[in-house]
C-alpha cells in the first residue's frame, strides 16, 4: 500500500485557485456567522441599556439617545429653576441612568428667541447646569456630565407663538458613549 503525503493529495485533487476560493469563502462565512452570535452593541451601549433608555422615554437621534428634546424638561420665561414635577422627572431619569450603568451624559440647555444672544446663552447654560445638579444628586459622576448652553439654536417650536416659545425653553439629556 502506497501512502501519499497530505500536500500531494491536495495538489492532485483540487486546482490551487479552487482551493483558495473554498478556504476564503469558508473564512468569510465564519466571520459573518460569528457576528450573529452576540447582539451588536448599539452606539456602544448594551441591549439592556438601550431598553432602559427607551423605556424611560429617550429617543434615538443623530446625537445619541436624547430625553427632553420636545419636553418635559421645560422652564418658565427667563427662569432656570426646575419646577417640582420636572425635578421628579429628572431624578427618575438619573436613577434610570445609574441603574443601567450609564454615567456619562451631556446636558443641553436652550432658550426661546426673546432677549439678547449673550444673555440667552448664559440662561441656557444655567438651565443645563440645574439639570446636571439633579443628576449628580441621584448618583451620577459630576466629572462625566458635560453641560452645554445652546441659547437660541436648534428650536423645536415656532418662536412666533407663545406655545412654541415655551417648547424652546428646555433642557435635553443626551447619552452617547462614543
Language-model region placement:
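Short, basic/glycine-rich phosphate-binding loops at helix/coil junctions
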Residues: 65-73
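Periplasmic peptidoglycan-binding/anchoring modules of Gram-negative envelope and division proteins
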Residues: 52-60, 74-108, 133-137, 173-178
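Active-site/binding-pocket entry motifs
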Residues: 72-74, 81, 113, 153
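N-terminal targeting leaders that direct proteins to extracytoplasmic destinations
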Residues: 1-64, 81, 88
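Beta-strand-connecting loop/turn residues
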Residues: 63-65, 80, 143, 152
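Periplasmic OmpA-like peptidoglycan-binding domain that tethers envelope proteins to the cell wall
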Residues: 108-178
Amino acid at each position: 500500500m502506497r501512502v501519499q503525503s497530505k500536500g500531494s493529495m491536495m495538489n492532485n485533487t483540487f486546482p490551487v485557485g479552487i482551493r483558495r476560493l473554498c478556504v476564503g469563502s469558508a473564512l468569510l462565512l465564519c466571520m459573518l456567522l460569528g457576528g450573529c452570535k452576540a447582539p451588536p452593541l448599539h452606539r456602544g451601549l448594551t441591549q439592556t441599556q438601550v431598553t432602559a433608555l427607551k423605556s424611560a422615554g429617550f429617543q434615538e437621534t443623530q446625537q445619541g439617545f436624547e430625553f427632553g428634546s420636545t419636553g418635559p424638561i421645560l422652564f418658565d420665561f427667563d427662569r432656570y429653576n426646575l419646577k417640582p414635577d420636572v425635578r421628579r422627572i429628572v431624578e427618575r431619569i438619573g436613577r434610570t441612568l445609574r441603574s443601567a450603568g450609564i454615567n456619562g451624559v451631556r446636558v443641553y440647555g436652550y432658550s426661546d428667541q426673546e432677549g439678547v444672544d449673550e444673555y440667552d446663552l448664559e440662561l441656557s447654560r444655567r438651565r443645563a447646569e440645574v439639570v446636571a445638579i439633579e443628576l449628580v444628586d441621584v448618583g451620577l459622576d459630576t466629572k462625566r456630565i458635560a453641560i452645554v448652553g445652546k441659547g437660541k439654536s436648534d428650536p423645536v417650536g415656532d418662536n412666533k407663538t407663545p406655545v412654541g416659545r415655551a417648547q424652546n425653553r428646555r433642557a435635553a439629556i443626551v447619552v452617547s458613549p462614543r
